[in-house]
Amino acid sequence: MTRNDVGIAVVGGGIGGLTLGLALRRHGLPAQVFERAPELTEVGAAVALAANGTRVLRELGLSDQLAAVSTVPSELVYRHWSDGRRLVAHPVGDWYRDRFGAPFWGIHRAHLQRALAEAWGGAGLHLGKELTEVRERADGIELGFADGSTVRAGLVVGADGVNSRARRSICDTTPVYSGTSGFRGLVPRDALPSLPDPDAVQFWMGPGAHLLHYAIGDVINFLAVIEGPAEWRWPAGTAPAEPGELAAHFAGWHPAVIEMIRAVPQSPCWGLYTLPPLRRWSRGRIVLLGDAAHAMLPHHGQGANQTLEDAAVLADCLAEYGSGEPAVAFAHYERARRARTRQVQRSSWVTSALLHLPDGPAATARNNDLKQLVNRFSWIHEYDHRSQAHAVGA
């Protein structure tokens, strides 16, 4: 058994953990990142980064590197499930950047993870460290890992995802299945001759299902969401799917949707989970970040972006109020973040049902509401973390 002393231990080497490490470094706060996987890999094909997320990455000096491997969508388009009509459209591209002060990017998760890891460097990243125990000591927190090693830290940040082990030290809240599931895929553009506006972010909305897609370079990333199964019986996050299962759910939809689904092998089915609101995000010297604190449904494309916000605000609060006795910093962090992330969670949950309406008066009313989308949800995209550490203390 080995033991090392670190100032701040970040549990989880995903987008949130690495971003936090980089943000702490900018403030001169030493941290070490502990990741359970033996090597860094990202689950999921791609991620949409809105202005509230790209603003954080720009401040970390990663803007040019990430822009080179990202795709900027031309529009946000909502379409009818069967005839493909453009029901509502909003500009993105330069208009979005000028409106919100930072760009919108579609990017491979692997490219984002790689850029963060390279910026962080290998010296502060410890792989193969599966957290098994959290023990409070008089001089800090002792973390025990599955390989038998231990680490004593002055402060611990749980950035270890929706099934967070660190969260058990704060509360016993567990994720809740939404009653919906998703299928992911990456399709070459040239395999989709029927697809209109391939450079746009597009939602195809229909009875009991929807399909979202956007371009990542020469491929189209899609997420198809269906209702059911009623109960999630698989212990892992995915369930096996039979060949053609997804296509059967979208029978009768527009040819572009069918082309997209049939262009790739049948993927596993992902259960879509959310995390009920936590009464607190911290206890003692332990605090949560990202999905560990507020896992949400993907229908606003805000999971990664809210995690980036968390990382920036937490680093700012620790720098402003001190990491030696973190209670004050944690309190400011929670006040800055809990209400906002809860609002995004609620809105994402409601959006799930709205995207699945059958044709009729309710769908018509939804389409009219979508025309005001930019005004209704500007509060998400225009967020600037730099005002938060000070604002919550005012």
Residue ranges and their predicted role:
Residues 9-38, 157-158, 183, 213, ...:
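Conserved mid-domain beta->alpha element of the FAD-binding
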Residues 40, 100-105, 301-304:
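Glycine-rich "substrate-gating" loop/helix at the edge of Rossmann-like oxidoreductase active sites
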